[in-house]
A protein has these predicted regions:
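Bacterial N-terminal signal peptides that target proteins for export
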Residues: 1-10
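Beta-strand-rich N-terminal accessory domains
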Residues: 22-88, 111, 299
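Beta-strand-rich recognition/accessory modules
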Residues: 25-41, 104-105, 116, 204-308
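Extended, loop-rich substrate-binding clefts of extracytoplasmic carbohydrate-active enzymes
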Residues: 81-131, 147, 151, 162
Length: 308
């Protein structure tokens, strides 16, 4: 599920990584057996039914088969070379038994793999289970002689079960006045037949200019551009009972957005990458039993710790 940015700005970002085996990792297997857990009983595990990198976050007390929080890691890797207006995909995630399975490395709190991509780009992808969620880290190395003005490799957190929010009734962003439903400017969504509401992308600008057209339709998808900018690179979804919050944030981004059919959360950071250089991009997914206020404060306290 790819998103095209509105207006004149095209968001393309790639996340890459340097190679090298790390001594801290004590196991190397095609897929790690079992799961890694944190102090509150949350689990992080590889979804082995997919060859391409997919992780699941399992809430405390839930069965290991639970699929409420699934993260495509990453969804795609896309670059735009200097002097070009066209984006090029170096990688696109596919479900099932498709492509080559990465060689996962596992430590007590971390799952990671490395991959060489077309275009002489090397990626290290690392997921670290912390006490309040998972930090996703991409280290990207440009081994070519090309300069990439934009690199883009978003994770794709997809929420189902108790977090699924197809009409965006529990998915929030934050602006200068506080919390606001991402889709608050489209109350008609609550009455639309689903086949009219979907497929849809709902976007809110952070650093990018707000598009002049608030509703656009491209390639059979309706894009809603929120008229008011957000004041933080943050998006959160409440569970149906309001007891849990899943929130994504990063250090900086152009906009935040969701595809409600998948209830995905995007806060996709991007960077430029010169020949022979590295870039590090990070996103944090908070999974917390608490209030929106609590989770937002946690995100803002941790925001500057995310590399970009």
């Amino acid at each position: 599920m790819l998103r095209r940015s509105s207006g004149t700005i095209i968001a393309i970002s790639l996340l890459l990584a340097v190679s090298g085996c790390r001594k801290a990792f004590d196991q190397m297997t095609p897929t790690p057996s079992g799961s890694i857990g944190n102090s509150v009983g949350m689990l992080l595990r590889v979804a082995e039914e997919n060859t391409q990198p997919t992780l699941r976050i399992v809430l405390p007390g839930h069965p290991t088969s639970d699929r409420a929080i699934e993260v495509i890691f990453p969804e795609h890797v896309t670059v735009r070379a200097r002097g070009s207006t066209d984006a090029k995909q170096l990688y696109l995630w596919q479900p099932g038994q498709y492509g080559e399975r990465p060689l996962w490395r596992r430590s007590e709190r971390t799952l990671e793999y490395e991959r060489n991509l077309p275009g002489a780009v090397h990626m290290l992808a690392r997921a670290t289970l912390e006490g309040d969620g998972v930090r996703f880290h991409f280290r990207l190395r440009n081994q070519s002689d090309k300069t990439y003005d934009l690199i883009y490799a978003p994770i794709d957190p997809r929420l189902t079960s108790v977090f699924h929010d197809v009409r965006l009734e529990r998915t929030y962003v934050h602006n200068a006045n506080g919390f606001d439903l991402l889709a608050s400017e489209t109350p008609s969504r609550l009455r639309m037949p689903l086949n009219e509401w979907l497929p849809v992308r709902y976007l809110a600008s952070f650093t990018w200019p707000i598009p002049s057209r608030h509703v656009e339709r491209r390639d059979g998808i309706t894009y809603y551009n929120k008229a008011r900018a957000v004041d933080a690179p943050f998006i959160a979804t409440l569970s149906q009972d309001g007891r849990w919050v899943v929130a994504s944030f990063t250090h900086n981004t152009g906009n935040v957005w969701s595809n409600p059919e998948l209830t995905c959360q995007h806060v996709d950071p991007q960077a430029a990458l010169s020949p022979g250089e590295e870039a590090i991009l990070e996103t944090k997914l908070l999974v917390v039993r608490g209030s929106l206020d609590d989770v937002f404060k946690m995100a803002m306290q941790q925001r500057d710790s995310l590399k970009q």
